[in-house]
Amino acid sequence: MTKIDIPKTPGDFVSLWREQGPVEDSKLELWKEEMAIDSWLMIAEAALFLDAAELFEQINPKLSPAEKATIGLVRRRMLGDTKLEQAIEKAIEIAKNPNTRDLKLEGRLRMERGLSRYENGDIEGAKDDLEWAELRLKSVAKASRDHDLSLLNRAALLMACNAPLMALNVYSEITRDGEHANETIAISRIGASRIRASLGHMFDAARHAWNAHSHAIKAYQTNMAIEAGTLFIELSLGNISPDAERMQIQVDEARPRKVEDSEPTLLVNPKDIDGVFDWCHANLPNSNSGEHRPDLRAMVSIAKNIDKLEFFNKLFLEPDEVEDATLAAMIQVCLDDEEHHRIWGERLSILTLI
């Protein structure tokens, strides 16, 4: 059996500190080195988010002036402060100062300013900052967490500005054979899949969704893997053929096309549909509760289309567990059974009661 090494994260560092801490600084240094965590700033942020105040206070003196300015922004945002413009400008000045300069953090802070400008309606200013930040981070910290975020934020801004083709171009910079995080690749391919589908490029849309599903699994992002997997199936439902090449082979053989090349025809082997469906079903949360359950909605809809409603027999017998009104409405019409229709109609009435 293949052994998968799960990467250590700043969150793991905090967990280890809670198990064995407090410890001396030398021990913290050893943990940081063993976990291959790039900076104390990453650990400080995790300590803030995970409410490890004592660890944060121990790490804080290790931060550079630019890192302290950055963590100050993080803390203010956590406390709900939305008026961060002056604090961001001050942090940028610290990161630019020759005595305290930090090229990577300057890129991150310009990204922060771009997001703040977008929130305040300054679209052009946001575009300038996000593009500048992405170029800087590409040059000094390519494929780092901050560089990945800058690419995803640029693409999101372009989508918000109704420029999907430009967003698609940004997503293409996140290569699958580079050093980008699997989570970043998965997010980018979900976005690219939806754009391609909107353009009618169904083969590319399905290919991107397939890749997103695979990389989300590698990133241990189960919810994202289910989102990508159901997207792949939904895109493929009208194009299933037992004679189709397996999707992974089609993906591996896909090559960039010239303008004059025709769009490949999407044909999907039913074994790939079954494999993705079975994985998604096996990895659904144990609970059916929650007012917003797009995962269950998608899976129930797909199950109806591919004659696999028996996978949800237990769900159909537990109407009181369902809190999503849209899901209840979908389940009500899944079976041609009077009692089933009545029970779920009653549940839907309760959920939609004003």
Residue ranges with predicted function:
Residues 1-24, 229, 236, 241-354:
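C-terminal non-catalytic interaction modules
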Residues 29, 36, 65-68, 99, ...:
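Residues that mark the junctions of alpha-helical repeat units in TPR/alpha-solenoid scaffolds
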Residues 57-61, 89-97, 131-142, 169-179, ...:
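Amphipathic alpha-helical segments of tetratricopeptide repeats
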Residues 47, 51-54, 82-83, 121, ...:
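Residue-level detector of the short coil/turn that links helix A to helix B
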Residues 45, 74-77, 115, 156, ...:
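Residue-level recognition of tetratricopeptide repeat
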Residues 6, 33, 62, 103, ...:
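Inter-repeat boundary and helix-capping residues of tandem alpha-helical solenoids
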Residues 38, 42, 67-75, 105-108, ...:
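"A position-specific structural signal for the A-helix of alpha-solenoid helical repeats
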